[in-house]
A protein has these predicted regions:
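An acidic, low-aromatic, low-complexity terminal/linker signal
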Residues: 1-150
């Protein structure tokens, strides 16, 4: 480890066989997947709405947003992601751990990961490659998918 490394805490997530991470400051909380209120005419990626502390939070499938197959075994976890005053829920297969990573050594994402810009880059954690998500881009992508409510 380099003595001058700028280490950042990341919340390590698993979706199917893939590992993703969010900066810990962008992940408000992780909780068991509650019952969600469905929305009519919602896109397939929008699983429903959650009311938490008086705020309506749209909840999306990480499989659809990240274009990665999930396990879908009924043990999914809801991660509340924040960008400024906006919050969205992302349903993932598993929250693994909190890891430390030097984001200054982050590698560019593979072309197949570029999509909507939700992947900032890739870091190594042990023997795993971890795609680091851009919380702002995740929120932007999922909010853009919300149906227009009259």
């Amino acid at each position: 480890m380099i003595a001058n490394a700028m280490l950042t805490e990341l919340l390590l997530l698993r979706q199917g066989a893939e590992f993703f991470a969010l900066e810990l400051t962008a992940a408000i909380e992780a909780l068991e997947l509650p019952v969600l209120a469905p929305l009519p005419d919602a896109p397939a990626s929008l699983l429903g709405m959650l009311t938490d502390r008086g705020a309506a939070i749209p909840v999306f499938s990480a499989s659809r947003v990240l274009e990665v197959e999930g396990r879908g075994n009924g043990d999914e976890v809801l991660v509340i992601v924040r960008d400024g005053d906006r919050q969205v829920g992302l349903v993932v297969d598993e929250v693994e751990d909190v890891i430390m990573a030097d984001l200054t050594t982050m590698q560019r994402p593979l072309d197949s990961m570029r999509g909507d810009g939700v992947v900032r880059g890739v870091v190594h954690s042990g023997n795993r490659l971890v795609a680091v998500l851009d919380a702002r881009a995740v929120v932007r992508v999922v909010v853009r998918a919300l149906p227009k409510l009259a």
